[in-house]
């Protein structure tokens, strides 16, 4: 879910924080991409009618086609993508995950009814609501990225939080995800619609946290409290308090704790066992990768192993895959003359750490610690 209604609220009260750009304007930029969100989008969008793409064995392949071609499109436009995969979800998210399971169960019932009635539109709608990213989808996308020469990292917790950390440390220009809580985790720049279908013709939206805070007149900590009031994945919100009222209350009382002391709790009853303090801590001090240990490398695609995996195992058309590899190699050669501040260094390993501010610009350039083993990006053989 992310943060309920945050994008609209920013558009209404802090419109100067949003910029719209064409994908070509990001030539030479490194971008950290929320991998799970991208895979979810591919499973929904890359379809034949209501059905996901499958090979002859009945294995889903929509995620691989989406990841392959959308990544090539980014590279052709000079973007250097870095995919960030989710780790273990925080305990606070268990309630939200349970709700999602319940919604999928409800969608399954509606799908069965639609199939019995032959309602094609509803069949497609409810089929998409059943989509869930599995470990197999994730593992296959990691293998694909490795063979394409595209770096990825594995976050210890929420991918959005580690994406935000990479932006704050200067490792990448922006975090790309549809989840607005990446701003709540402190990402200076958030990009939406980067991995959207080209056919949708959606401009890429940039949200700039410093302008959001400036226009709202809030500190980051107050912004976190505002996001909790709007509704997040980690705790309930106060029923009856909408976005504009939430902004007014934060501006007037500064903290959720003070708001609780002053609002009429009969009119605005607090959630039972409200875990707002735990949610605050999770946003302000999430479990993230240590940016000092992150070194990224963009390498040549391994054409033969890509063909073996995508065509031999997953039964994609060999000519199309080879053409895709040629496009990728050609684009990589053309993008070496990018922005001066944007070049991938040697590969390294990633360690889990609580988020911390980089002490100096130089600290983000330290060599990767080879004894860290949480996650690694490896070059294809």
Swiss-Prot record:
HAMAP family to which the protein is assigned, alphabetical: Fen
Q: Where is the composition biased (Basic and acidic residues)?
A: 96-113
Give me the residues that bind DNA, please: 47, 70, 158, 231, 233
Q: Does the keyword Hydrolase apply?
A: yes
Under the subunit heading, UniProt states:
Interacts with PCNA. Three molecules of FEN1 bind to one PCNA trimer with each molecule binding to one PCNA monomer. PCNA stimulates the nuclease activity without altering cleavage specificity.
Q: Where is this region: Interaction with PCNA?
A: 336-344
GO MF annotation: an example: magnesium ion binding
Q: How is the cofactor bound?
A: Binds 2 magnesium ions per subunit. They probably participate in the reaction catalyzed by the enzyme. May bind an additional third magnesium ion after substrate binding.
Binding residues for Mg(2+) 2: 179, 181, 233
User: Which Pfam families does its entry note?
Assistant: XPG_I, XPG_N
Keywords in alphabetical order, please.
Answer: DNA damage, DNA repair, DNA replication, Endonuclease, Exonuclease, Hydrolase, Magnesium, Metal-binding, Mitochondrion, Nuclease, Nucleus, Phosphoprotein
Biological process annotations from GO: base-excision repair; DNA replication, removal of RNA primer; positive regulation of sister chromatid cohesion
| Name this polypeptide is given | Flap endonuclease 1
